[in-house]
Structures are given as C-alpha cells and as structure tokens.
UniProtKB/Swiss-Prot annotation:
Name of the protein: Clathrin heavy chain
Spans annotated as WD40-like repeat 4: 150-195
UniProt membrane topology term: Peripheral membrane protein
Localization, UniProt: Cytoplasmic vesicle membrane; Membrane, Coated pit
Organism whose genome encodes this protein: Dictyostelium discoideum (Social amoeba)
C-alpha cells in the first residue's frame, strides 16, 4: 500500500477503551469533529453514562453518570449538549456549569453542530438554530418539506456563511433505501426537494475569479443510476461554474444494500470524500467531479463521519468500533493521477494549487511546448502557477526577455510578471528582474504600491537596486530584509545617529567600549581585565574586540592581566581566536614553560601560530612539543638529529603520521642510511603504520635500494594480510624465497588471490627452488598447464608430471596429454599415463585434445575399458562411433542400436562420409533441421517427405514450405505423389493439410485436396475437407466455386456463404443459401449485396414468409419507399421499426398512411410512443374530433410531449385541447397568449402559479398595453428576486416608468416582499422621483441592498442621500469624503463629528482638518478634540502651520501637550514666546522635553525680556552646554545661576574661568560662594595661586582647610594599606621557600626521552637561549590560574 494516493490508518479502537459494542451505533454515538467522540452507554448494572473521548488523549476518558436521551459534543470547545425529554441543555465541562437551556415544543428527531457557535435542531415539522452565546431560544429557520415527512434524518449541513442549508433523510421503499434531500436558501427563503443520500457544501474559486463560489455536492443511488453531482448555488465574482456529474460505481456483488452515507470536502486539495454504508471510500475532484480513487476501508457498516482538519481528510466510525482516518498522501497522489488515471490536467492543477511533488516533468514539458509554439500567455500562466522554483527562476525570465516585442501588444515578459503579481508574492529573483525596468522608467509609485501590498520579496540586492533612486525606499527594503549593515550605513549617511543607537539596541548592535576600558586600565588594571572578560563573554556579546583589549593591556605591560584575560575568554577552540591563542602560549613559554606545556598537553587550542610556538618550544627545551609544531623538514631533521634518541619511540611513530609522505620517506631513509641495524625496527614500525599513505610500492623500493630483504619481509608480513596489491603479494613471495622461507612461499602461492600469476610463474622458474610444488600450485591455479608440462618435461622432472595428474589435479590430464603430444612424447608412455588416471580424467576434454591432433585411435583401449565399466557419457560413445565409422566396423548397426551417442555430433561427422548414415543418426535423434539440410544437399526428398508426414510438426512444415526453401517444389511433389497417398492416418493427413494452409499455398492445397477428396475414396465424404476445398477455391480460384457447389453435397453452406460474400461472390452465396433453404439470408444477399429490391420483392412473393417481408420492408424504408414499406410491414405484421417509419412518414408528409400503420401497431403493442405519434398524426391531418375521442379514451400517450410538438408546429388549437386535457395550465397559458386571449391567459397563469408563466403573460400584456392585467402578473413576478431585474428592464425599455413604480409600490405590501424590491424601488426613485428617495431610505434602510443604491445615488449626484447610505453602511471613509467634496449639500457638523472617528483611512483626518480650516475655521478646535486621540500630532501641527492658522488651534495644542510630541511642543512654545508668557513657557519646558532645545535657546538668548534670556541659560545647562549657560548668566549678572551651572558641569576649566571673572569683578563673596559650590573638582594649586595673586586668601581659606583635611585622611589610609600588603608578601615568600626545599629532582634516573617526574622533558636549553636555573616545580593543572603569580615571581617577573 506504499503507492496508494491516500493515507489510511486506524486512529482508535473503541472496544479497547472499554466501550461496549451495543453502545456503538447511530443512535448512541456522535462525532461532530475529529476532536471529540461522545457515547451514551448503559452498563451491565443498568446505569446510564455519557462517555467523552478526546482523540488527542484517548487514554484520559471522561465518563459521567447521567440519564439522558441524547448527547452531542461541540466540535471545538468542551461543551456538551444534552437532551432529556424535550429539554435541551448546554453544559461547559471545564467550568462544570450549565451555560443555557430551553424547552422544545416538539420532540427532537435530529440535531447537529453546524458551526462551533450554532446547534441545529430538527423536529418532525421544522428546523431550528440555537446559538450557544446569550440567552436566546432556538430560532426557526424553515419548515421540513412534505417529501421528508415520515423519514429518518441522518445529516444536516450548512455552507460557511450559513446562507445555504441542506437536510438529508432516508426511508425504505420497495425493499431499498431511498434518500431525500431538502435544499434551503436562507436569502430567498425557498426550499427544493431532491433525491439523494448525502450532500455537502464547499467554497471553490472558479478559474478567473478572486472570490469563492459556493458549490453544492450531492450523491444519490437510485434504482436506475448512481451519480455524484456538483453545482453552483452561490456565484463568486468570476465566470459561472459549469455543473459537473459523474457516475458512482457499486460492486455488483453487494446488490442494492449499499448507498452513500456521508460526504466531506477538503477545500485545500479540492477533493470530495464520499463514504458508503458498507465501507467504500470514493475520492472525487471537486472541480470536475471525476473519480480519483475508490477502495474499501471497512468491512463493517460506517454510520458517522466528520472532517479531519489536521490532515484535510475524513474520519469515520464503523459498527465494530474502529475510528478510521483517510487523507490524501502528498507524495503519491500526483504520480497516481498521472500513471493510473492518466489525467495530466488534474495532476497539474492539484500540484500547482497545493505545491505537491510529482508533476515537475509535466509542468516543464507543458511550459516548453507552449513556449515553442509561441503561446506565451499560456506558458506564462503555467510558470506562474507552478509550485516552488521549478519554473519561477531566472532562466524562465530570461526566456521571456529573449522574445522579440510585437507592435501594439504588451511584451511577453510584462504579461508574465502581471500573472505573477495576480498570483501573489514574487520571489527574490523575480522581484529583482521586475524592479530594474520599473526603476529605469522612473515609476517609483508603482514600486511603492507593490511594497505596500507585500508583492515583492525584500532582499539586500533589491535594496541596492533601489538605493540610487530613493534612499528612503531602499531603507525600508533593507529593514525588511534584515540587512543591518546597509541600514546602519544609510542612517549614517543621513545623519540619523539617534536611529542608529535605537537600531543597535533593538538588534544587539555593539557600541564602542574602548574609551571606558582605557580609563579603567590606568586606574584599576585587574578590574579592567575582569570587565573586559565580561564584555567578551557576556550573553549576546562580545561587545568588544579581544585583540584590541590585548593590544591595550600589552601596551601598558599588564602581563599577568593579559594572561588571565586570554585564558578566561578562550573557552572554545575557534579559528578566529588564533592570534589570541598564540599570544597566550607565547607569554607562558617565555615566562612559564611548564604552564605552556600543560596548556598544550590539554589540547585545548589548535589554531595558534604553530611555527612561532614550535620555535619557542625548542628554545624552552620542549623538544616533543617542538616536533608537534614543526612542519618544515629542515626543522624536523634538526630536532631529530639533536634529540631523536631522547624522544619516545611510540611518540615518534605517532608523530610520523603528521608528516607528508615525501618528508616521511626522507626521514626513514636517513634512519636507514645512518644506522640501518639499530633503526630497522623503528623504520618497519613506521612503514607498517603509514603504509597506505606512503604506498607499499615506495616502501618496497626503499628496502630494496638498501638490499634489506629481511626488513622487507618483516614489513610485508604485516601488510600482505590486508593488501590486495599484486605487487605486494609478489614481493612478499620473492622476499620469502630470498631468505629461504619456502613454506611461506608455498602458502602464499596457494592462498593468495592477488599476486600476478605470470610474473610469479616466471620468478619460480628462474629461482629453481628445491621443491617444484609452488610452481605446480601457481600453474594449476591459473591454468598454465602447457607451460608447466613443457618446463617439467624438458627438465626431466617426469615424476612431478605423474604426481600432478594422479594426485594433484587429474581433471587437467587432457591438457597434459595434449602438451606431451605436441612434444612428441612416446605413445606407450602416454597410454600408461592415461590408463593410470582411469575414470578420474574427463572424457570429453581428453577426446577433444587427442582428436585435434588426429590421434583418436590412441584412446581406443581406454574408451572400450570405460564402456565395459558401464560408462554412458556421450563423449565416449561419440568417439567410439567415429572410430567405427572410420574403420567401417558395422557403423549402421551401431548407430541404430546405441542409445548414448550424440546424434547431432555423429550426424555431422557422417555428412561428408556417408549422407545416409547421417540421415539415420539425425532421424534417431529427431534433429529436424539438420536432417532437412542433409537431405536437401543430397536430394533425399522422398525420405524427407516421409519423415515430415510422420513427424507432424507444424513448425518444421512451416520451415520447409517457406519461400526461402529452394527445394520446396521437389518436396511438395514427393508429399503429394508418395508420402501422403501412402498414409492412412487421419492425423497425419490433417497435419499435412494444415501445414499447407498455414504456408498459404492455396493452389498446391487445391491439388492436394482434389487428390484426397475427388479422387480418393477414404476421405471423399469428409465434411471438413469439402468445406476446406470450397473455401480454398473461394480464396485462390473463384472460377471453380460454382462447380464445387454443384458437385459436393456435404459442405456447410451457412458458414461458407458469408465467406463468399466477403469475396464478393454474391450470386454463389445466394445460391448456397437458396440450396439449403436459408430464405432470410438469401433475400438479405439480394438486398444488401446485389442491390435489387425488385428481385427481393419477387423472391418475397414466392416465399410468402413474414420474416422475408420484414427484411423487404426495412430495405424499402431505407430507400424512402414509404408507402411500399408500410404495405410490407403491414403484411409482415411487424412493429419493430415503427420509429423509423414514423420518421420517414414525417419527412414525406405521409400522415394518412401513417395513421393506418400506427393503428396496426396499436393493435399489437401498447407503447406510449405509438399512441403519442397517432395523436400527432390526427392533429396533422386535422382530425381533432377523432383526436379528442382518442385522448378521452384509455391510453398511455405522452400528451404533454404531443402538445409541445403541436405548439412548436403552430397547431395551437390542437395544443389547447391537449393541454386542457392534462391540466397543464402553464403551457395552456402560452397557447392562449398566442391566440390573443389575455384574460383567459391570466386565469390559466393563476392556476399554473409558475414564475415563467407569469413572465410570459406579463410581457404579452405589457406589449398589448393591458397594464391592469400586467400588474396582476407583475405582483407574482417581483416576489422572486432573480426575475425582478428583467421585469424592470421590460418596463423601462418601453418608457412605462410610472406603471413600474406603481407595481413595485403595490408589491411592498406583500408578505413575500424582499430586499430586491425595496432596492429597485429606491433606484427608480433615484432616477425618476428624487423627492421620495430620502423618505424611502429612512423607512426601509434595513431592507435595502445598500451598495446597489449607493451606485445609483452616485450616478444621479444625490449627495445627502449618498452620505446617509455611507454612514449606515459603515463606509465612513466615503461618507466623510462625500461631505468634504460636496459640502454645500451634504455637510453637517454634528454628523461629521460623529462619523470622522470611525474612518479607517488616516489621511482623511488631515483632509478634514484642511477642510475645516478653509470652510469652518471657528469649529476647528471642536473637530480636533474629537480627532486628538487618533491623529499624528506632528503631521497635524505641520499641516496647520503650513496653512497659517496655528494661533487658532491653541486650545487643541494645550490639551494634547501631555503627549510630549516635538512638533506640538515647539508650536506651543512658539505661541508662548509670541505672547511673552514666560511662566507658561518655563512650565512647558519642565513638563515636556521633546523639542528643539538648542534652537529655542538660541532664539531666546536674544529676547529683550530678562526672564526669556534666563530660560535660554537654563536650556543650555540642560543640554550640557555649560560654557554658554555660564556666559549668558554672567551677561545678565545672574551670579547664582552661573555658579550653579559651573557646579553642575564638573569641569575645572569652567570653574576656574568663573573664579577669574569674579576676581576681575572684585566680587569676593561670589568668589567664596563659587569655591564652596565647586569644591569637589577645583584644583587647589590654581585656587591658591589665584587667591594669592589677588590678595584674597582669606576668602579661599574655608576651601583650603577642607581640602587639607581630606588629603591627610587619604594619605593615612594608603600607609595602612601598604603595611598590610608588605606583611602579606613576606608571608608568601616564606611559604614558597618552604615548598621549594621539600623537593630535589633526581637527574641521574631519566627515562628514554622523558624525565622520570611529571613526564616533562629534562633537556638542556637550546643554543643561544639563557635559561635561569630555578628549582623544578610539581605542576598541578587544576591550580594553573592560581600559580601564575608564583611563576612570574620565579622568573623574575616581566
């Protein structure tokens, strides 16, 4: 089931959850959605429970004990509806409370949730809707149709808008289940009864539409047909949906018991799921009603289903308790539709709409086909609809760009982009390609519109394209595309630095912390290091570059802090930290090598500068670390030469893995060159470890160059086990042989499958080993038997030859014998050798080898010995046969009686020696084709013919009788003359005849058959042979047919006559039929083939058979001989062709004769069609009295149909009689209208009560100006909304406006008055009686189609009425716009104020402000008070300012200032300045900070009033412009303000300048006050100098005394701190000396390459590196950070 188009699974098994099978049924189980299943169950102890199962959590079953008649769960929420008697309740399960209840007046028969908010209730007579919100009772929606009375309701559905409803019921009739559906329109309030079993609604977007239509799907199974029907009940904004229908297949074996029970629609896939009672699932395409898939999903009856939203499928429950889920399989549905259904159009449509895989090739092919055919619009549509980027890519765009433009037509590329924009959003590539030409043409508004509608995918590249044209637009694109760098760049270019900061905070952009860090490094180095670590490691960071921190610390010689910082931030091993890792290791190698070694040993860092660190390691004596870091071969050789013996061998083997193969080989050669014996084991170990990298060939060459075969053997011993290289295996064999490891040579030759056999063979020959077994093994394995035999024979090693054939491989004895024969070995030796092998030698090969050399007789003793032993091998007997044939030793007897030789082999051997013996051998072995060939070559045709007759092989006959056989004629002669006449076997004769037939030899077959049938005696009366003879003559020699018919009597004429007809032997066929009394067939030949109706008439007269007359009548009918054919049919009493006769009579207008014929037919059969035609014939011949008598008598005629025919043929009087007879008042009305009887027509129309009839009479009365009667008709028409527009058009086209208005006004009193009537009357008032329009709108507004009336008012420029409609239709934007544009007629201030807050388009606020400022300026503040909460104050103030009315709106500005908007604040401040209201200005500044403070200060500092200049100084101080603030205060002699500004600045320069000013002004009090206020930042030396120079020390003493007191306190604190630190340092040094004295290293007991303690290398320092002698310390990696200070002290610091 992996390739099915559906996913099918069992969701739950209710019986496994403890639900009894008696509780699983339609009356006890409900499922309104996939979420809940609700069950009423009765326990064994008669307790009633309601069980609620949440399918998402089926293990948590909610079981409530309650007695209820029915229960149903809300599809979405945990709300339970209960029915107890006629009381309904809604209960919230979560809140455990009753939400609402009601009492039904009638018993409830069915209920269902049609939405999460509405519960539908069905009683015996009506349908109600009950909403779960509020306290309302159920509301009646419609009455049940009479057709649904006494039926069982099984379903109730609604569309998404609840404008269409459908009620589904079933009942029993004639032993089958009949379905009945009531479709109800809420808008039209009408019902329709339809036959059907299941129905549903769906929203569907018709191609070419943007708004969906509502489709209604219905499935039914009647006694005659089973169908599914899809039709449109509510139209969208596109073309009409064409009704679709499809047959539904039900397996014949299930009978009439199955029928549809439910239908669900997946609007995503546009698929209808239909489920039948017996468990069949049908999937139909919604748009075409075509069947997609059908299968059985349940063997039990399914009784309830629901739509499964999670999978867009269907969920169902069967009687067994299985909860089943069926949905579309996204992966398989499209391949299934393509491959199984072969519906490529549906596959493409579904794939495009749902982005499903499987149709890529179809789409591409379709696109290419359209494109190549020049159908670019269709190609563009295919590309636009295609999913993903299959076609929506750059290549497609380039294809459309390459199309040359066509004059006066839009380009193909433009059409393509237009379709893409209609489809939705463009992708990145499409957006770029579309924007480029738009920008080139300067059409920025279009681009802005697309961005507003989200039609383009924003990207950085798109922003780059837009940026040269519009930076603001590019900024918007960058922002949407998250191109932060470009956003920051644009902000910087425009000087919007505040926005940069805000953007950085929002998107975690890094500010510059370097300045702060520099200041901290000078004051608190350790604190700076900690802070730097936090900046780098902080979440969301790093906020600062670590390299810059290192440079900063290093420049200040903060070594310890740098090391601590680096070790703290380097948590992971990242490539970007390479410089930092290098710096960390460099510091420690220079000052603490042990720590560096520990760090490198932890392998925490790998990205540092390895060359730099390697050199430092070598200088520090860490040779192993140096080797790990060096990559240059010269460096490596240097270290190995100086300290190779001090490095561990295991490390060296491992280390060699880091070298490239060339360097590795160079080092190994150095080892072997300097001391091969000492270094051999090391080199072998290295070679084995890195054999694959160096390649075995290179290593072998290296060992061979030093002639170290022992080393080569040791190396290959390790490698050969896993190697598949032929060279490796050969070299191993060679090395083993050279060091005399012969057993290993033998083992490898036997076990290895990889060495080169020829090369190994040649080596072993040349080596001349003491034992030839390895050579024998190689030659035997690789079939070098001839070489082996030559080598052994020429070297006199015969014992190895005998041992080989006798013990090692006797099977190869033939090859050995052949080789020895070629060497002219003695025959006695060969016979003895062969006999010693006996039957172990294969006979066929031995015979072949000997026979090739013409020495076959050599084997005769051996062959006869084998036969004597009972050997039955064909090769042995073949050889004996050949020997006997050559020696002529009674060969024919041997060939006839020996059963074991191969006939083909021996026959072939005899062909040139004795052809007859070859024939004997071939015949014995049934070698057909060989026998044919040898007899053809040797003209043995008689033997061949007898063999063929006896053989009876059709294939063989076909072979010899083919045209390619040049001996065919000779063979046929022998068969006809000798072989077949000799045969008395009927089977042989039959096989031979059949062979001639199959070979298509008709003349030869006739010759053969005449020989057998006409001349022979035994087969003369054979019926089959007579038939065959005549048949062959028909096909081969037509002239003989008549003679054969006369001479032969035992043939089958009924079978041969049709064949004769096929061969156009019509007279012969007629003669055959006539000879054997087949009269019907005979006349048929005369009519059909000979074409003589006259001969046929004479023949019929002679025969006088009814069947013959029937045939004749049919022929006459076809010949349009109407009178004659009617006569013939009457004689034949044949009514079968009455329809054709009627049609012919109508064509010839022979109704008089037709009446006779139909009267004859009516006597024989009572067919409604015959009686109907008889009535019409009466009407045509104007026999109305006979017609009326006939229709009043019992009859089964279709009087309605006949009446319609009479009406169509203008026989109105006859039609009137017929319609009156059947009371068809609708058609009767039409007749009366044609006859001009209008009053009678109105009376008949009233009885018909049909809209169509009323329309017909109305139109006739209007044309006849019978307005009273027309109004009677119109009253019955206008109540139908669909007909109203046409009726209005009829009146208006004829200019009867008053009559039309009178008609509609009279119709408003009707109970059936609808929206359309009120609407159309309003439109008529608008057109013709404007004075009545407003009154009509106010009285009947709620019953109007407002958009339609709005359109009429617009067309007729009725602005007050239009404004009224806009407001009541909630189109407040249009209402405001109308009042603004047409203020003289439509504006009303109160109405305007009430409406303006409700508008959606914000631009209207500002249009309203402009409107009021221009036309109603005194009411502007009243308007602004309403708009204030909603408008952009900045924009509003800018607008008012531009119009010059700022003072007019001061009340608005004051009331809105709490919003703290810059433009608003600045405008109000401007007004305060103009009004010289400094108090209000100061209050405004303090309360609101959002305005241009500097600009205002600059403006105020020149103001003539002091208080405004003081405010300017205050503003400078608030903006940290201390110097300007102080200077302004000094000018106005506001010394207190100046001193306070200087104090707030904390700037010593400003303070000193102010002191100097007071000294210059000799204002000593102000000088002292300034010292007191600015004490914390003034420098004492400057203060003392200034006071001393101006002789005012007394005024400075308070400052000096306070400063001395503070300074001495700080010095005392520093002295105490220094003493404490000194004491602590001494204690640490003492402890350090104690630890150093406890350990003395033993330098005499060192391991190979490593010190005995701690594993550190104990080597002298490198040349040129002066290392200070310090006691060696025990290293503890866990205390590394704590030990930094100690190591710094040991190495003397930095």
């Amino acid at each position: 089931m992996t390739n099915l188009p559906i996913r099918f699974q069992e969701v739950l098994q209710l019986t496994n959850l403890g639900i009894g099978s008696n509780s699983i049924g339609f009356s006890t189980l409900t499922m309104e959605s996939e979420k809940y299943i609700c069950i009423r169950e009765t326990t064994p102890d008669d307790k009633n429970n309601v069980v609620i199962i949440d399918t998402d959590n089926p293990s948590q079953i909610l079981r409530k004990q309650m007695k209820t008649d029915a229960a149903i769960m809300n599809p979405k929420e945990p709300i339970l509806a209960l029915k107890i008697g006629q009381v309904l309740q809604l209960i919230s399960i979560e809140q455990k409370m009753q939400l609402k209840s009601c009492q039904m007046q009638e018993p409830l028969e069915f209920w269902k949730w049609i939405s999460p908010n509405t519960l539908a209730l069905v009683t015996a007579t009506s349908v109600f809707h009950w909403t779960k919100e509020g306290n309302s009772d159920p509301v009646k929606v419609f009455d049940r149709h009479p057709d649904l009375q006494n039926t069982e309701i099984i379903n109730y559905r609604s569309d998404s808008t609840q404008n269409w409803l459908v009620l589904v019921a079933i009942h029993q009739r004639d032993g089958r289940v009949v379905g009945r559906i009531q479709l109800y329109s809420v808008e039209k309030q009408i019902s329709q009864s339809i036959e059907g079993h299941a129905a549903c609604f769906a929203n569907y977007i018709v191609p070419g539409a943007t708004r969906p239509s509502t489709l209604f799907a219905i499935s039914s199974r009647t006694q005659n047909a089973s169908k599914i029907l899809v039709l449109e009940v509510s139209k969208g904004d596109g073309p009409n949906f064409q009704k679709r229908a499809s047959d539904v297949f039900y397996p014949p074996e299930i009978g009439a018991s199955d029928f549809p029970v439910a239908m669900q629609v997946s609007e995503k896939y546009e698929v209808i799921y239909m489920v039948t009672k017996l468990g069949y699932i049908h999937l139909f395409d919604l748009g075409t009603a075509n069947l997609i898939y059908r299968n059985r999903i349940s063997n039990e009856n399914i009784f309830v289903t629901a739509f499964e939203e999670s999978t867009n499928g269907i969920i169902a429950v069967n009687r067994k308790g299985q909860v089943l889920s069926v949905s579309i399989d996204d992966k398989n549905i499209i391949p299934y539709i393509c491959n199984t259904l072969n519906n490529l159009e549906l596959a493409i449509s579904m794939a495009c709409k749902n982005n499903l895989p499987g149709a890529e090739g179809l789409l591409t092919t379709q696109f290419e086909r359209y494109f190549q055919q020049g159908q670019y619009k269709e190609a563009a549509k295919v590309a636009a609809d295609s999913p993903g980027s299959i076609l929506r890519n750059l290549q497609t765009i380039q294809k459309f760009q390459s199309i040359p433009p066509i004059p006066d037509q839009p380009s193909a590329l433009l059409q393509y982009f237009g379709m893409l924009l209609e489809k939705g959003k463009l992708n990145k590539v499409e957006s770029l390609e579309l924007v480029r030409p738009v920008l080139a043409q300067g059409k920025k508004p279009i681009l802005e519109k697309w961005l507003t509608e989200d039609k383009l995918e924003c990207s950085e590249q798109l922003g780059d394209e837009v940026r040269p044209h519009d930076r603001k637009l590019a900024l918007s694109i960058y922002y949407r595309a998250n191109a932060s760098d470009k956003v920051i760049t644009l902000f910087a270019e425009t000087g919007e630095f505040d926005k940069i900061i805000a953007y950085c905070k929002k998107f975690n952009y890094k500010p510059d912390f370097m300045f702060l860090l520099q200041r901290m490094a000078n004051a608190n180095p350790m604190g700076a290091a900690d802070f730097a670590v936090k900046l780098v490691k902080e979440e969301g960071g790093p906020y600062i570059d670590a390299n810059q921190v290192v440079e900063l610390f290093s420049a200040r010689n903060m070594i310890q802090e740098t090391s601590n910082f680096l070790f703290a931030i380097l948590d992971g091993d990242r490539p970007q930290d390479a410089n930092l890792q290098t710096k960390l290791l460099e510091i420690n190698l220079l000052h603490a090598p042990q720590n560096a070694d520990a760090i490198m040993g932890g392998q925490k860092f790998t990205h540092y500068n390895r060359l730099r660190i390697g050199g430092l390691c070598e200088k520090a004596g860490l040779y192993q670390r140096a080797l790990e870091h060096y990559t240059d071969l010269a460096d490596i050789k240097r270290v190995l030469s100086h300290a190779g013996h001090m490095v561990n061998q295991e490390f060296l083997v491992s280390y060699f893995g880091s070298l490239n193969p060339e360097d590795r080989m160079e080092c190994m050669r150095d080892f072997l060159r300097t001391n091969p014996r000492q270094n051999l084991q090391l080199v072998v170990a290295i070679a084995v470890s890195y054999s694959d990298q160096i390649t075995p060939e290179a290593i072998i060459a290296m060992f061979e160059s030093f002639r170290l075969y022992e080393g080569l053997y040791l190396y290959l011993t390790q490698v050969v086990v896993t190697s598949t290289s032929p060279e490796v295996h050969f070299k191993y064999i060679e090395a083993a042989a050279k060091i005399n490891q012969f057993k290993e040579v033998e083992r490898m030759c036997r076990d290895s499958n990889y060495y080169d056999p020829e090369k190994t063979r040649d080596f072993l020959k040349e080596a001349k080993l003491p034992d030839q077994l390895p050579l024998i093994i190689v030659c035997d394995r690789y079939e070098f038997i001839s070489d082996l035999t030559n080598y052994l024979y020429k070297n006199n090693l015969s014992k190895y030859i005998e041992a080989y054939v006798q013990k090692i491989n006797p099977v190869n004895t033939p090859l050995v014998v052949g080789a020895l024969l070629d060497l002219d070995c003695q025959e006695d030796y060969l016979r003895n050798l062969i006999m010693s092998v006996r039957n172990m030698c294969p006979a066929d090969s031995l015979v072949e080898q000997v026979e090739k050399r013409n020495r076959l007789k050599l084997l005769l003793p051996w062959l006869e010995a084998r036969v004597a032993e009972g050997n039955i091998e064909p090769a042995i007997h073949n050889a004996l046969a050949k020997i006997y044939i050559d020696s002529n030793k009674n060969p024919e007897a041997f060939l006839l009686h020996n059963q074991f030789y191969d006939s083909k082999v021996v026959g072939k051997y005899c062909e040139k020696r004795d052809p007859y013996l070859s024939f004997v051998a071939y015949k014995r072995g049934l070698c057909d084709y060989e026998l044919i060939e040898v007899t053809n070559k040797n003209t043995l045709f008689k033997n061949q013919a007898r063999y063929l007759v006896e053989r009876q092989d059709p294939d063989l006959w076909a072979y010899v009788l083919s045209d390619q056989n040049e001996y065919k004629r000779s063979l046929i002669d022998q068969v006809v003359q000798t072989a077949l006449p000799e045969s008395t076997n009927a089977t042989e004769v039959s096989a031979t005849v059949k062979a001639f037939m199959d070979a298509n030899l008709p003349n030869e077959l006739i010759e053969l058959l005449e020989k057998i049938v006409l001349e022979g005696k035994e087969f003369k009366t054979a019926k089959e042979l007579q038939n065959l003879l005549i048949l062959t003559a028909i096909r081969a020699d037509k002239s003989r047919v008549t003679d054969y018919i006369n001479r032969l009597d035992n043939f089958d004429g009924s079978k041969l006559a049709p064949i004769a007809i096929e061969s156009q032997l019509y007279e012969e066929a007629f003669f055959m039929y006539k000879k054997f009394q087949f009269n019907v067939e005979a006349i048929d030949v005369l009519i059909t083939h000979i074409g003589s109706i006259e001969r046929a008439h004479d023949f019929a007269e002679r025969c006088n058979q009814t069947e013959v007359y029937s045939k004749l009548g049919v022929a006459q009918l076809k010949a349009e001989m109407v009178k004659e054919c009617i006569e013939s049919f009457i004689k034949a009493n044949d009514t079968e062709h009455y329809q054709e006769v009627v049609a012919a009579a109508e064509r010839k207008d022979e109704y008089e004769d037709l009446v006779k014929f139909l009267q004859m037919c009516r006597k024989k059969i009572k067919e409604p069609a015959i009686e109907s035609e008889l009535i019409f014939a009466y009407a045509k011949v104007n026999k109305l009295a006979e017609m009326e008598d006939f229709i009043n008598s019992p009859n089964s005629a279709h009087i309605q149909v006949v009446g319609d025919r009479c009406f169509e043929n203008g026989l109105y009087e006859a039609a009137k009689v017929l319609y009156t007879n059947i009371s068809n008042f609708s058609r009767l009305t039409s007749c009366l209208v044609k006859l001009g009887q209008y009053q009678a027509a109105v009376d008949a129309a009233r009885k018909a009560n049909s809209t169509k009839t009323w329309k017909e009479v109305s139109a006739a009365c209007i044309d006849a100006k019978e307005f009273r009667l027309a109004q009677v008709c119109g009253i019955n028409i206008i109540v139908h909304g669909d007909e109203l527009e046409e009726l209005i058009r009829q009146y208006e086209d004829r200019g009867y406006f008053n009559e039309l208005i009178s008609l509609l006004e009279s119709g408003l009193a009707s109970e059936r008055a609808h929206v359309g009537m009120f609407t159309e009357l309003a439109i008529l008032y608008s057109k013709y009686k404007e004075e009545k329009l407003m009154e009509h709108l106010k009285l009947f507004y709620s019953r109007l189609n407002v958009p339609k009336v709005i359109k009429a008012c617009q067309a007729n420029q009725q602005w007050p009425q239009l404004t009224y409609l806009y407001i009541h239709y909630d189109e407040h934007d249009n209402a405001i716009q109308t009042m603004i544009n047409h203020s003289i007629e439509a504006w009303d201030h109160v109405l305007f104020k009430e409406t303006i807050p409700k508008v959606a388009k914000l631009d209207l606020y500002y249009s309203a402000i402009s409107f009021y400022l221009e036309e109603q300026p005194l009411l502007i503040n009243d308007l602004l008070s309403v708009l204030s909460p909603r408008i952009d104050h900045t924009r509003a103030v800018t607008l008012i300012r531009s119009l010059g009315h700022l003072p007019l709106v001061k009340p608005y500005l004051v009331s809105a200032q709490d919003q703290n908007v810059a433009a608003l604040n600045e405008a109000l401040n401007e007004l305060y300045v103009e009004e010289e209201d400094y108090e209000s200005l100061r209050s405004s500044i303090d309360a609101n900070s959002n305005f241009g403070t500097i600009a205002l200060a600059q403006k105020l500092e020149k103001h003539e009033l002091l208080e405004f200049r003081r405010i300017a100084a205050y503003l400078y101080k608030k903006n940290n412009r201390w110097a300007q603030s102080v200077e302004l205060s000094k000018k106005d002699k506001l010394y207190k303000d100046a001193i306070q500004s200087a104090s707030d600045s904390k700037n010593p320069a400003i303070g000193e300048e102010l002191l100097q000013y007071f000294v210059d002004q000799q204002n000593n009090s102000a000088f002292a006050a300034c010292l007191y206020t600015c004490y914390d930042f003034l420098k004492p030396d400057a203060v003392i100098e200034l006071a001393w120079r101006n002789n005012i020390l007394n005024y400075s003493f308070p400052y000096l005394i306070q400063y001395v007191k503070e300074y001495t306190t700080k010095v005392d604190q520093l002295v105490d701190d220094f003493k404490a630190r000194q004491k602590k340092t001494e204690e640490e040094k003492e402890q350090q000396n104690i630890e150093s004295s406890q350990y003395q290293p033993d330098l005499t007991n060192l391991s190979y390459g490593y010190a005995a303690t701690g594993g550190m290398l104990a080597l002298p320092p490198a040349v040129g590196y002066q290392q200070q002698q310090q006691p060696q310390q025990m290293y503890n990696p866990n205390q590394m950070m704590g030990g930094f200070q100690q190591n710094y002290n040991q190495y003397g610091g930095f």
